[in-house]
Design a protein with these regions (language model features):
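Glycine-rich adenosine-cofactor-binding loop
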Residues: 21, 31, 40-60, 71
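Conserved S-adenosyl-L-methionine
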Residues: 61-66, 146-150
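NAD(P)-binding Rossmann-fold cofactor-contacting core
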Residues: 62-84
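Rossmann-fold NAD(P)-binding glycine/threonine-rich loop
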Residues: 12, 127-180
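Rossmann-like adenosine-cofactor binding region
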Residues: 85-152
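Short helix-loop-beta connector
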Residues: 13, 36-42, 123-124
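Phosphate/diphosphate ligand-binding glycine-rich loop within oxidoreductases
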Residues: 1-34
Length: 184
């Protein structure tokens, strides 16, 4: 949580309150379970909110080749750049060649909202990830899927970060299977 400067789980240890971050584990595990190869790939992150440092750390752990970041408010992207100097910032709307694109903005929480991309230029071997899990298919994911891209929403990230928090609090991680996931 020090590197990400983000805490989403707190617990008590020897009368001290400790802050931890399970978003890194959640994002990394969800990518691994999606069977997408991330190593030596180029990632483009849309947004610069609180979860983005965790996403960057997870991508680095998975040995992505290059990380690009764009945000509607350029100052917020530059704050992330101060934390991760190797990240290349872009102006909002600029798109570079990428293998994985991650929507970490709030665009898509409302059904009528969509990210303005030229989806026709995006080949079928691209991977679109949206941290939003409700709705389960945002306009971003729907359009990408219509053009043949692989897509994943943030549901599994949410589940895995919750499992990480549960393990911190209880000392063990419960097993989950497809049946349980369908219920969530």
């Amino acid at each position: 949580s020090k590197i990400s400067q983000s805490v989403n789980t707190i617990y008590k240890n020897e009368n001290k309150i400790i802050g931890d971050n399970t978003d890194i584990f959640g994002f990394e595990t969800s990518l691994k379970k999606s069977n997408q190869i991330i190593k030596n790939k180029k990632a483009l992150i849309l947004g610069a909110g609180g979860v983005v440092p965790s996403i960057i750390i997870a991508l680095q752990k998975m040995q992505v080749l290059k990380i690009f970041l764009t945000n509607r408010t350029p100052e917020k992207a530059l704050e992330i750049k101060k934390m991760f100097s190797e990240v290349e910032t872009l102006s909002w709307g600029d798109i570079v060649d990428f293998d994985i694109i991650i929507n970490a903005t709030s665009i898509g929480l409302k059904p009528a909202e969509s990210i303005d991309l030229d989806y026709k230029k995006i080949s079928k071997n691209k991977f679109f990830y949206d941290v939003i899990y409700n709705p389960s298919e945002t306009g971003f994911l729907k359009k990408a899927r219509q053009f043949g891209a692989h897509t994943e929403n943030g549901k599994m990230m949410f589940i895995y970060q919750a499992l990480g928090a549960f393990k911190i609090w209880n000392g063990f991680q419960p097993k989950i299977d497809d049946e349980l996931i369908k219920l969530l």
